[in-house]
């Protein structure tokens, strides 16, 4: 069974609710909600999404309630094509919002009142230093192409100091806010959009900190905005989700994952024995919460930057590209890429999203590095996405080799989560580091890491994976770049992150020469 089905019942109690209302209101509700769901799915990610129909049947849940009621069979968990969508956080949000809009339209039609849909979250968030010790927090509203009433009329800015909780927020009708800051403390900000329909989900989090007598200003750019389903493939006689290769990225947390898929054989699709049928999974995580993208990594990076003696601001990668946040004003840039990589949704008809280095970002970084900038980049797919990704081009590879001074040496670079510093460069501590490679409720899992090779004069290996000696980090003293094939924020502890960040910034901004393996 493929597609969406709606169920209602009109024949109970002579076709009337207890208050006398016609039970055909349940049919109206079902039709409106289903129409909204199917329309939104077809317009965004699957133009051939199937609308199965409306059933007037005496299901208990449709028959007993004394108010307009519907049952929604959105998709089938036994259908691989459906679950490629159903496992994706973007699809879950799209459908949930469509259900909300459908219910709102139904209530509006019953009472003959206009309705307003809550806005979408804002984007292009940035926190930069302003005059008089203040910080300017700015963003861009997002217009909903599926709903004209969802335009924001104002915003609420929430503030967190150091590792405390967020406050109750400050309202503004403009897409920016000046915030007072106490030197030496980290201020974090998230923004919601509001209108008569309600308040949007919160934006990602940006942060800033002024260090008295600091060594310089660093800009943290969050380029990790990916949320997606696990890697899925259908080839010849096999189909399924390959969570050991790429478990996807939940939106903050996931409670639906129960374990990795074990049976991929399409010949077992009709098997009635659950444990050996197509799609059979382990159950070792069925009571666990799985961590995902917290959208709060500028704070994690910034805390280590501040402890190294540098002031920092932060911005989303969209703010750098769309609104022109200037990199040239900063001594160094820390680009967060986490598990960012080009991925599709469902069968891929909507194209790719979440590329590590978009053409616009490449142009911005080229200009910054040509002007004597200093750049730190970390992520699981910094090379894979530019060499073998779905949107990879020769220009991408040239950018990596010419600007960032590394080349691709393979993915799945390590089976163990240990990295050691091997360079003789005096600026790096000869330490060993560990990154998170298991499921945790508050951290995302790193399934794969990239192996890199130095490219160009002055580039040298800094770190290697312990289990196979492949290169995990490349630096270039002449161009002041440092690139890691695993995410910085995935390191096990604050102590490890603080030590490594101090070494990296000392190398990038300390004027020391390169070293050899």
Task: Annotate each PLM feature.
Residues 1-31, 55-78:
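Active-site microenvironments of hydrolase-like enzyme catalytic domains
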Residues 48, 406-494:
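Catalytic beta-strand/loop cores that center a nucleophilic Ser/Cys/Thr
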Residues 48-113, 485-490:
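Active-site-adjacent mobile loop/cap segments within catalytic or ligand-binding domains
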Residues 106-149, 183, 197-216:
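Pro/Thr/Ser/Gly-rich low-complexity, intrinsically disordered linker/stalk tracts
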Residues 178-199:
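Beta-strand-rich modules
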Residues 205-331, 336, 502-516:
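Aromatic-Pro/Gly-enriched surface loop or interdomain linker
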Residues 215-224, 231-243, 324-392, 482-484, ...:
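Short alpha-beta junction capping motif
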Residues 339-443, 459, 500:
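A glycine-rich, often tryptophan-bearing local segment used as a flexible ligand/cofactor-contacting loop or short
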